[in-house]
């Protein structure tokens, strides 16, 4: 370990971030619990989007398990063993959630694209059985990438206040961490391209059919696309703009102390945006899942509005959620 890394106070002054992480956690746990209750109460016919959203919700619960530990550690009040546990386990859970969220948002975009652009044809990818299979493959892939960071043996170091997770790693652990980061950036870039291309094709199709009587819900569909795209960009793009430079500072390719401190603070700020997907996801559930939307309406609408809603004939087939294929 070099003198620069030994005496560079990188991991100080994290308390301001913890308040925002706590706010995200509080909003997110309420939204996730309500979403779970809504999906359980309202039986769904397991359309593709519903399957992907349920997987997204499951990933969000991993994040709700990890955030309290991160908050306690960053406040500097965690015992030494909890700090080690955070570096080995809960920090990895945060990234498992992040990349599962990215991948399942991409599958939501693909499904909506096929529903609207190729509405007369059903592809295998649109079948519920295939959606369940691909979801299992996604979980397995992400876990195979991330779990080694949890189980690779770590070093025993003397207890101190200003310590980062990389300092616990042996040489093989550092190399695997570096490899994991580059794999995750590749996942981000590939699935970002999928989301952007899918949404572009949907917008183009909606624009071409803007005067068609069969497209009465164009505005709602566009709103859904904008929600998915905006939440994706806000949550995940800033973090990945910082991730590679920050990883290089962890491996001391970037050794200047002030630069390393700035990159760490930028990483924490953009990680805060990334975990804020925990707050955005319930909004996506509302717009993309009919079961969730109906349960929210039943819970918060007045009896008069509910009665009027029940008397109102169904004029749409949930264009804004998944379409008709699955």
UniProtKB/Swiss-Prot annotation:
It is a multi-pass membrane protein. Residues 41-48, 111-133, 204-221, 290-326 are cytoplasmic. Residues 1-19, 70-89, 155-182, 243-268 are extracellular. It is found in: Cell membrane. The chain crosses the membrane at residues 20-40, 49-69, 90-110, 134-154, 183-203, 222-242, 269-289. Residues 305-326 are annotated as: Disordered. Residues 307-318 have a biased composition (Basic and acidic residues). Gene3D superfamilies: Rhodopsin 7-helix transmembrane proteins. Disulfide bonds join 87-165. One of its GO terms (biological process) is negative regulation of myeloid cell differentiation. Signal peptide: none annotated. InterPro entries: GPCR_Rhodpsn, GPCR_Rhodpsn_7TM, GPR171. One of its GO terms (molecular function) is G protein-coupled purinergic nucleotide receptor activity. G-protein coupled receptor for Big LEN, a 16-amino acid neuropeptide produced from the precursor protein, proSAAS (encoded by PCSK1N). Acts through a G(i)-alpha-mediated pathway in response to Big LEN. Big LEN-GPR171 system plays an important role in regulating feeding and metabolism. Also plays a role in modulating fear and anxiety-like behaviors in the basolateral amygdala. Big LEN-GPR171 modulates the mu-type opioid receptor signaling and antinociception. Acts as a negative regulator T cell function. Belongs to the G-protein coupled receptor 1 family. This is G-protein coupled receptor 171. It comes from Rattus norvegicus. The lineage of its organism: Eukaryota, Metazoa, Chordata, Craniata, Vertebrata.
């Amino acid at each position: 370990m070099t003198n620069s890394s030994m005496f560079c106070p990188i991991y100080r002054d994290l308390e301001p971030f913890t308040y925002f992480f706590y706010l995200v956690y509080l909003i997110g746990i309420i939204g996730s619990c309500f979403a779970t209750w809504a999906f359980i109460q309202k039986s769904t016919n397991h359309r593709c989007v519903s399957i992907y959203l349920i997987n997204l919700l499951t990933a969000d619960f991993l994040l709700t398990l990890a955030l309290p530990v991160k908050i306690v550690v960053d406040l500097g009040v965690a015992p030494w063993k909890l700090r080690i546990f955070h570096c080995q386990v809960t920090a990895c859970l945060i990234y498992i959630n992040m990349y599962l969220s990215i991948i399942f948002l991409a599958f939501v975009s693909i499904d909506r694209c096929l529903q609207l652009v190729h509405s007369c044809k059903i592809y295998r990818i649109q079948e519920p059985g295939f959606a369940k299979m691909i979801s299992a493959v996604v979980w397995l892939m992400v876990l195979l990438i991330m779990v080694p960071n949890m189980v690779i043996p770590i070093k025993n170091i003397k207890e101190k206040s200003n310590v980062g997770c990389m300092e616990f790693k042996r040489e093989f652990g550092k190399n695997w961490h570096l490899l994991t980061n580059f794999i995750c950036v590749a996942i981000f870039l590939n699935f970002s391209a999928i989301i952007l291309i899918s949404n572009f094709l949907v917008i183009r199709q909606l624009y071409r059919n803007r005067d068609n009587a069969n497209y009465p819900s164009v505005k709602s569909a566009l709103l859904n696309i904008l929600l998915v795209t905006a939440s994706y960009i806000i949550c995940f793009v800033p973090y990945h703009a910082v991730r590679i430079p920050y990883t290089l500072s962890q491996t001391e390719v970037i050794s200047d102390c002030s630069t390393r401190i700035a990159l760490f603070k930028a990483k924490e700020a953009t990680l805060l945006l990334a975990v804020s997907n925990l707050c955005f996801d319930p909004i996506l559930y509302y717009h993309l899942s009919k079961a969730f939307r109906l349960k929210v309406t039943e819970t918060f609408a007045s009896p008069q509005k509910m009665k009027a809603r029940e008397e109102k004939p169904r004029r749409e087939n949930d264009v804004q959620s998944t379409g008709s294929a699955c």
